[in-house]
Amino acid sequence: TPIKSSAASDVYKRQEYHYIGAKSQHVEDWYRYPSSMDVRDFYGGDLQGVLDKMDYLEQLGVEVIYFNPLFVSPSNHKYDSQDYDHVDPHCGKIVKDGGRLLEGWETDNTHADRYILRTTDSENLEASDRLLIRVIEEAHKRGIRVILDGVFNHCGSFNKWLDRERIYENKPGYEKGAYISEDSPYHDYFSFHDNNRFLYNPTYDGWWGHDTLPKPVSYTHLRAHETRRHL
């Protein structure tokens, strides 16, 4: 049965950004069948909702809460991380908001002002991190353990280390992504087949060949020490 979600959980708006051939959208009809490619469709739900239901979960006898990745990411499954350092404000807390949505014909995410503000602003990121900490603390008070999923053999094309979408390119406080510049501090995090293609080099390795899932260099690779340290 569809539940009434908090206002924060409904923040994914239609046309907030473009991903894998279409715009993000908030699903209004819970009874429709999922599409074959619904990774950018969102049904609501956030960490505040989990926090609000913590007593109920305890009464049910829940001993463990297992989360899909909660890192910043454009997909609903979030196995294509955009920022490993922070909780996605769409699941956490959006303190600072505004900016335009993409027009129906637009596919360039450098114009996705609202999405960029929501996912790169330090106030939003830090507030979301604090909310996760509170969820964990309240769970532990009730003897409930929390497991956070994560994937590190690939990230996402939105990831700030690569920044194929150029979301971070002109944002203060962020380094240039490896897609954008050969001089990026993250250049050696990825394998490029042609280093003569900069600026904006699309020749990086992708997991199973998917360009939306760039693959950091193998942990056994000589260049991987910095990637290992960061993770």
Each model region followed by its residue ranges:
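Short, cationic motifs built from Arg/Lys/His that form the positively charged side of catalytic pockets
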Residues: 136, 225-226
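Formylglycine-dependent
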Residues: 192-219, 223
